[in-house]
């Protein structure tokens, strides 16, 4: 029987896809990732998140289900204790599992407050082995210095740059690996997410000098948002992630297991830098994400391993929801029989691959979106409180964009004469994808408020 692959999932937070050189970044921000895409992995050039908020995206990745199906539709909801998770499925299949970095699935608004405390074993989603993590990493650390906790709840303090120190823990797992069983290791960083308590992006020292001469993405308009102030440090964070991703690859090679290891690089969502703040409904909140625009939903996704061509740029539209299914498939498991949605990305080259991503919006407004290869169709219920209500029975059309002709999403086709057949097809597809997520609702036609 063929030996099963080890799996390393290197995960960033709030990273735009266009921070990578292979996605158009002109500065030398991601040389290791670019080389990885060029030589070893498949670059999924049209990868989208199904939920652009930190906690819900993480719940989705651990369970292979939409956030509304687990109840984790916004931040500050803990992952239910009985959920079938990646870690539990892989452990049952004989894998050694490890987790490092930001968890963000243990604390809630009841009696469970682990933002700065050790995460109890039962709230780790099945990661019962190697554990070096904090529930809310931005509460226990800053760009330089902080602490996480080990498996036994002992505090592990660090003084250096956070991305380096978190990666140290992942590299240690690889160095100490005995090879008795295949392993799954998730290294979950907070960079390049902003530092909440300081209202800043904390790149390594010298980031503003190194990346001050940046070319802004076309969707970031001059005079809007705060990208002009923060983008150099944001790129500095991404550069640190790149260097540390390279350290992980080097550790796998030094251990002699690189060729036997699937490696995944992805982020939970992108960042619009407060440039699209017209999205917030009453009771809602936004700063850098929480909407359906391309800068928010497009994420980097690169994979090396069995079933993935080296140096391929895959132009098929894919969802982060496909990643858990991909991991289980790599471990020899059947995702569908385990209740995981999505489709293994090993099959993305298939002619019957469905290019449609379903997106749930929370915290800023209660909305749903369908992203196809060419179009984006967005609906919302502005009367719902996006902090207390997860969905609606009746949505109203909000946006329809032709991304081929209007990549910056400035021309809402719903405000003019709309092709009725196109509108019908997109609505039908949206409702079909919603049903797959366990949702049923009606959609009313757009009207100007």
Where is each model-derived feature located?
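Long, internal low-complexity/basic segments
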Residues: 1-5, 16-17, 43, 200, ...
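Active-site-proximal N-terminal segment of extracellular/periplasmic enzymes that hydrolyze or transfer
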Residues: 1-42, 91, 408-419
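Active-site regions of oxyanion-processing enzymes, predominantly non-cytosolic
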Residues: 2-9, 112-132, 163-216, 253-262, ...
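Histidine-centered active-site microenvironments of extracellular/periplasmic hydrolases
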Residues: 28, 114, 251-312, 319
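Polar, surface-exposed loop/tail segments
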Residues: 30-31, 61, 93, 102, ...
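Catalytic-site neighborhoods of secreted/periplasmic enzymes
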Residues: 60-160, 195-209, 367
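C-terminal, low-complexity/hydrophilic appendages and adjacent surface loops
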Residues: 144, 151, 293-294, 361-415, ...
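A long, amphipathic alpha-helix that forms part
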Residues: 167-175, 217-261, 433-434
């Amino acid at each position: 029987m063929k030996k099963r692959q080890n799996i390393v999932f290197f995960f960033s937070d709030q990273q735009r896809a266009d921070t990578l050189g292979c996605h158009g970044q002109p500065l030398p921000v991601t040389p290791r990732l670019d080389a990885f895409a060029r030589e070893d992995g498949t670059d999924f050039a049209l990868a989208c998140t199904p939920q652009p908020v930190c906690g819900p995206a993480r719940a989705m990745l651990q369970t292979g289900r939409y956030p509304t199906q687990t109840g984790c539709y916004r931040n500050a909801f803990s992952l239910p204790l009985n959920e079938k998770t990646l870690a539990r499925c892989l452990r049952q299949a004989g894998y050694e599992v490890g987790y490092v970095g930001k968890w963000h699935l243990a604390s809630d608004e009841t009696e469970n407050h682990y933002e700065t405390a050790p995460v109890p074993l039962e709230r780790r989603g099945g990661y019962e082995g190697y554990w070096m993590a904090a529930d809310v990493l931005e509460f226990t650390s800053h760009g330089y210095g902080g602490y996480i906790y080990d498996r036994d709840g002992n505090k592990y303090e660090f003084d250096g740059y956070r991305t380096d120190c978190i990666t140290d823990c992942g590299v240690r797992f690889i160095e100490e690996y005995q090879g008795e069983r295949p392993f799954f290791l998730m290294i979950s960083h907070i960079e390049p997410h902003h530092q909440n308590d300081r209202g800043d992006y904390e790149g390594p020292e010298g980031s503003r000098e190194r990346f001050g001469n940046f070319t802004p993405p076309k969707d970031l308009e001059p005079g809007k948002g705060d990208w002009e102030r923060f983008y150099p440090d944001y790129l500095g964070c991404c550069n640190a992630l790149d260097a540390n991703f390279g350290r992980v690859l080097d550790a796998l090679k030094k251990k002699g297991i690189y060729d036997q290891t699937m490696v995944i690089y992805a982020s939970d969502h992108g960042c619009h830098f407060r440039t699209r703040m017209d999205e917030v409904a009453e009771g809602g909140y936004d700063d850098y994400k929480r909407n359906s625009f391309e800068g928010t939903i497009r994420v980097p996704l690169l994979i090396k391993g069995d079933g993935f061509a080296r140096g391929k740029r895959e132009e098929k539209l894919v969802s982060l929801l496909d990643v858990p299914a991909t991991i289980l498939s790599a471990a020899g498991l059947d995702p569908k029989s385990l209740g995981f949605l999505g489709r293994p990305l090993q099959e993305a080259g298939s002619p019957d691959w469905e290019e449609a991503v379903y997106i749930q919006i929370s915290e800023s407004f209660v909305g749903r979106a369908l992203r196809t290869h060419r179009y984006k169709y967005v609906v919302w219920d502005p009367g719902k409180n996006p902090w207390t209500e997860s969905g609606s029975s009746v949505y109203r059309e909000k946006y329809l964009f032709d991304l081929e002709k209007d990549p910056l999403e400035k021309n809402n086709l719903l405000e003019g004469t709309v092709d009725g057949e196109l509108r019908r097809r997109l609505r039908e597809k949206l409702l079909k994808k919603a049903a797959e997520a366990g949702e049923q609702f009606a959609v009313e036609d757009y009207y100007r408020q």
